[in-house]
Curated annotation (Swiss-Prot):
PANTHER family: POPEYE DOMAIN CONTAINING PROTEIN, POPEYE DOMAIN-CONTAINING PROTEIN 3
GO molecular function, one term: cAMP binding
Residues with attached carbohydrate: N4
Protein family membership: Belongs to the popeye family.
Spans traversing the lipid bilayer: 27-44, 48-70, 77-99
Keywords: cAMP, cAMP-binding, Glycoprotein, Limb-girdle muscular dystrophy, Membrane, Nucleotide-binding, Transmembrane, Transmembrane helix
Any one Gene Ontology BP term: heart development
Protein name as catalogued: Popeye domain-containing protein 3
Record GO cellular component, one term: sarcolemma
Annotated membrane topology: Multi-pass membrane protein
Amino acid sequence: MERNSSLWKNLIDEHPVCTTWKQEAEGAIYHLASILFVVGFMGGSGFFGLLYVFSLLGLGFLCSAVWAWVDVCAADIFSWNFVLFVICFMQFVHIAYQVRSITFAREFQVLYSSLFQPLGISLPVFRTIALSSEVVTLEKEHCYAMQGKTSIDKLSLLVSGRIRVTVDGEFLHYIFPLQFLDSPEWDSLRPTEEGIFQVTLTAETDCRYVSWRRKKLYLLFAQHRYISRLFSVLIGSDIADKLYALNDRVYIGKRYHYDIRLPNFYQMSTPEIRRSPLTQHFQNSRRYCDK
């Protein structure tokens, strides 16, 4: 205790007070280093934010080392700043290698830049998602799924082309790029349940889509809860878009247009009108989403 008090006394009480200050300013290298430190500490998070921070801090420490060697002639100041410069340089190279090593096929690049990057998904997280999937080509007029025959065993996201959805030969709606092919079917089943498609999905043009196997995707969800919540939001939004697309085509009479926001009103006000297969399928789709 006495030793600490004596140290504090030597540093504060008995330390000589600066009576004369240097009149001339330090060299330009010193001020450049200070500016680089200020700007460097304004960097953000993520890979590119770290690259920004370590690059500017490294340059700042390098300028400080040069200033200590040329102007101050202090070996200890030079040594510390040079060591810190080397550490920042090594961190920069390590992070740059990580970013450079994350490369994707063209379909995944489109998917990331158009859908996942605007949501703030980092490249490492997207890489985890992409490694669990595969890119599949579907030729024109070939079927992705057939009504009453194809089992629901995967989840797919269209990257290019256009898919036509029909039920009993009657057109329902189109599926465009960056939309899921089978989000209602996926959402209608629990992880332990099995099911088959109630619609037919046919490629109107040559299509490319990214597909995740059902069991593999559920395993990914169990390992990464963040990815599970992300897909839950994406699938829910996709189902809502499909329901509103159906709403534009469903009529329950010559003068009545079925609105998904007022289903009970139409059931009470027009009970005598016979529903078409399209209307019935629309209501079944709503039941899937209500589960």
